[in-house]
Curated annotation (Swiss-Prot):
Topology of the protein relative to the lipid bilayer: Multi-pass membrane protein
Designated gene of the protein: outO
Gene source species: Pectobacterium carotovorum subsp. carotovorum (Erwinia carotovora subsp. carotovora)
Pfam family, one: Peptidase_A24
Name of the featured protein: Prepilin leader peptidase/N-methyltransferase
PANTHER family cross-referenced by the UniProt entry: PREPILIN LEADER PEPTIDASE_N-METHYLTRANSFERASE-RELATED, TYPE 4 PREPILIN-LIKE PROTEINS LEADER PEPTIDE-PROCESSING ENZYME
InterPro entries: Peptidase_A24A_bac, Prepilin_IV_endopep_pep, Prepilin_pept_A24_N, Prepilin_peptidase/N-MTase
Compartments it resides in: Cell inner membrane
Family: Belongs to the peptidase A24 family.
The keyword Transmembrane belongs to this UniProt entry's keyword annotation: yes
GO MF terms, alphabetically ordered: aspartic-type endopeptidase activity; methyltransferase activity
UniProt keyword list: Cell inner membrane, Cell membrane, Hydrolase, Membrane, Methyltransferase, Multifunctional enzyme, Protease, S-adenosyl-L-methionine, Transferase, Transmembrane, Transmembrane helix
Length: 279
């Protein structure tokens, strides 16, 4: 690790170039998770129903690794040369080679955001546990943000994994002490849980989902209980302002469900930046 730190300090251009490339590669994989995980969960749910009803529907194997990447329109396998992060999308001008249908801008956008996030983390931390942890946390938050926007779901497979990883990283006090991390996880979950039930009791409506509780618990495990007030404040204010402006411009129904996960993720990024500056 000391050698890698020395390399980063002696050859910053090479180091940040490598981080940028790593960000593009990881971003490409994050797109796979964003696309496939909701489908995997739906298939699992359908299989559970089939087991209860006794109606079996043979299903092909489907996970993050299989089948190989294919065109979302015609299902033709994507060649390796057309699967290079960002550059393939730009080279093909946002269209698939096989059927010339448009490919969502989400794919290059996620890759670019991941690259920029990795570069920003590299500015805050030298190579070490804190940097690797920051890259993992930022990657999870980006995936959760996009999935929540698209499906209004924050899968347990991601939120609970993120929570346990936060505790593991803080076993050695990478970001905060283990005591602060454990208290942060409990406080994060209970604070939104209490808010949920208080609002439901007062209005009869549900303002949050259980996935939000688990995501805030995970952020508490990474950043400690001290970060939670500012984190929630940033999430609430950014969510309120942007949502009011967005719905006002689009004249959307105010009763339409709102994904709160992305705003918690923004609060988590804010908390991570403050941790990086030791504020």
């Amino acid at each position: 690790m000391d050698d890698l730190r020395e390399f980063a300090q002696l050859f910053p251009a090479w180091w940040f170039g490598a981080l940028g490339v790593l960000g593009l590669i990881v971003g490409s994989f994050l797109n796979v998770v964003i696309y496939r995980l909701p489908i995997m969960l739906e298939r699992r749910w359908r299989q559970d129903i089939e087991l209860e009803t006794g109606v079996a529907d043979p299903d092909t194997r489907y996970n993050l690794w299989w089948p190989p990447s294919s065109c979302p329109h015609c299902q033709q396998a994507i060649a390796v040369k057309d699967n290079i992060p960002l550059f393939s999308w730009l080279w093909l001008r946002g269209r698939s080679r096989c059927c010339h249908q448009s490919v969502s801008v989400q794919y290059p956008l996620v890759e670019v955001i991941t690259m920029l996030a990795f570069l920003a983390a590299g500015l805050l931390w030298l190579p070490g546990m804190a940097l690797w942890g920051a890259l993992i946390l930022l990657s999870f938050l980006l995936v959760l943000t996009v999935i929540d926007i698209k499906t209004l779901l924050l899968p347990d497979e991601l939120t609970l994994s993120l929570l346990w990883m936060g505790l593991l990283f803080n076993l050695s006090g990478t970001f905060v002490s283990l005591n602060d991390a454990v208290v942060g996880a409990m406080a994060g979950y209970l604070s939104l849980w209490l808010l949920y039930w208080a609002f439901k009791y007062a209005t009869g409506k549900e303002a949050l989902g259980y996935g939000d509780f688990k995501l805030l618990a995970a952020l508490g495990a990474w950043l400690g209980w001290q970060a939670l007030p500012n984190l929630v404040l940033v999430a609430a204010l950014s969510g309120l302002v942007v949502t009011l402006i967005w719905r006002g411009l689009r004249k959307e129904d105010t009763a339409k469900p709102l994904a709160f996960g992305p705003w918690l993720a923004i609060g988590g990024v804010f908390g991570m930046i403050m941790n990086g500056f030791n504020l």
